[in-house]
């Protein structure tokens, strides 16, 4: 299923365009971004959008992730019996497991407090087989059980993707290093600092940090060393206004989607002009 297409979460709104929109929503829910009371993301800033079941936002988040999980479950279930080389099928299954682990990791962070204080509290429903409209829904289980599934998916994917080399034209595809990066994040949330550091070092061994000079040149090249998972946009691809690139336009502070989600002058004034963050 397209992970960056308009309406991929079922909300069919200009701020419903898959993983990039969910990343924007998550940014607005954090403590380091503020909203001035306008724009769509106000409803995320005040947590209204995530906690009310009768409005578009929580339905968008829930639908996108579980629609993705269900499609991945079909791949995981049936790929072994499909035609093709065994190694190719191993890699495909590894990528599906990795993305399913990522999806449950995202759901766990959206619908429960952090693992360190909430592992015995409700997690999210876990589905590992394809479902249809009449499938009986599953209970939430505990957050610890959710993280057990996340780790199972990601560690299995890590081993299955051994030796897989992705094309630079498709940075959206999981390879082993991307899986290790997600595992580092998962262990960090679980406060398992040693494992988080171990996996972060594995990533850094393959993708060195961006230099200060490269950092100052901007973020328009998906081949920049620090970018290990992303979307390559080509001139032939055009989703019009319903795209992350239209949504991220911030040249006009009166832009209808972003009036409340733009770097303030007061924030810019905190940094010296010679500092890398200012540049």
Kindly give the residue locations of the regions a language model identified.
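Short coil/turn linking the two alpha-helices of tandem helical-hairpin repeats
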Residues: 108-115, 165, 189-191
